[in-house]
Amino acid sequence: MSTLGMTLLILLLLLPLATPDDVGQPPKRDTLRNLLKIGTRGQGGCVPPGGGRCKANQACTKGGNPGTCGFQYDLCLCLRN
């Protein structure tokens, strides 16, 4: 059997394993991008990159410590709990 034929056979055998049972459902794990939103500190709190403010369940942090960021344009992370 040729290499291409063998590769196709292996892919066909693995296809059922690659298909999740809950197709169309959102992933169960949050990605790192969803967990950490890097923003800058504006007037009155952490401002996410797209503008606006962190939600009530997010905390403005600097250097891994919860709290305010000190200066207006310090880098901060909006962490989802």
From Swiss-Prot:
Annotated keywords: Disulfide bond, Neurotoxin, Secreted, Signal, Toxin
Cleaved signal peptide residues: 1-20
Molecular function per GO: toxin activity
Coiled coil: none
Main location: secreted
Tissues with expression: Expressed by the venom duct.
GO cellular component terms, semicolon-separated: extracellular region
TM spans (from-to): none
Disulfide bond annotation, renumbered to this chain: 46-69, 54-76, 60-78
Keyword Isomerase in annotation: no
Location in or out of the cell: Secreted
Propeptide residues per the UniProt entry: 21-40
Entry text on domains: The cysteine framework is IX (C-C-C-C-C-C).
Name of the protein described by the UniProt record: Conotoxin Cl9.6
Species classification: Eukaryota, Metazoa, Spiralia, Lophotrochozoa, Mollusca
